[in-house]
A protein has these predicted regions:
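Helix-hairpin-helix
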Residues: 1, 26-27, 34, 117-119
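Acidic, metal-coordinating catalytic segment for phosphate/diphosphate chemistry
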Residues: 2-5, 50-164
C-alpha cells in the first residue's frame, strides 16, 4: 500500500485508540517515511486499566472485514483493517523508548544497534523491554530514542535515516 493511504488508515486507528491511551506513536515504515507500507505499527501506553478496552476497540474495527484480533498484554494484531494488517505494541513508561525504537526499525538498523549495544556492554532487547547493562543485568533508565543512541555512543538518527 502506498504511504499516503497507509497514513490515513493509521490515523483512523489512532483516533479510535486516543481516548484509551496516555501516549501513542505510529511507528514502522510509516514513521521511516517509506513509499510503500506492508503493515501499520502503532506503539502506545494505555491509560490505567484500558488494555481490554483497546482490544474491544480493535475488534470493532475488525468487524466489517470479518478480521480477527489476536495477542495479549504486550501486543495486539488486527489481521486486516481496510486491507492492511495493524500491529499495536503495548508499552509502559520504562519500555516506551526501546519499543518505539525497535518497532520503527528498519530490521537491518535494529541489528546494527543490537551489535553496537553488545560492543559497549549492553543488550538492546528486541521485544522492547529496555536497554540492559549486561554485567549488572539491570535496565538502563532511558525515556527517549535520543537517550538510547547516546548510551550506545552514537549520533541520533531520524527515523527516515534508519534504512541500512
Amino acid at each position: 500500500m502506498n504511504r499516503a493511504d497507509a497514513v490515513i488508515l493509521a490515523e483512523d486507528v489512532v483516533s479510535e485508540l486516543t481516548p484509551l491511551c496516555e501516549k501513542f506513536e505510529i511507528a514502522g515504515s510509516i514513521r521511516r517515511e517509506r513509499p510503500l507500507v506492508n503493515d501499520i505499527d502503532i506503539v502506545c501506553i494505555p491509560k490505567f486499566l484500558q488494555l481490554d478496552a483497546i482490544k474491544e476497540r480493535l475488534e470493532l474495527l475488525a468487524k466489517p472485514a470479518r478480521a480477527t484480533v489476536t495477542g495479549g498484554d504486550r501486543y495486539l494484531k488486527l489481521s486486516s483493517f481496510k486491507g492492511i494488517q495493524v500491529d499495536v505494541y503495548i508499552a509502559d513508561a520504562q519500555t516506551w523508548a526501546t519499543l518505539l525504537l525497535v518497532r520503527t526499525g528498519s530490521k537491518q538498523h535494529n541489528i546494527k544497534l543490537a551489535q553496537r549495544a553488545r560492543e559497549v556492554g549492553y543488550k538492546l532487547n528486541a521485544d522492547g523491554h529496555g536497554l540492559t547493562w549486561i554485567s549488572k543485568d539491570v535496565n538502563v533508565p532511558v525515556h527517549t530514542e535520543e537517550q538510547i543512541f547516546k548510551e550506545l555512543g552514537l549520533a541520533y538518527k531520524e527515523p527516515r535515516e534508519r534504512e541500512v
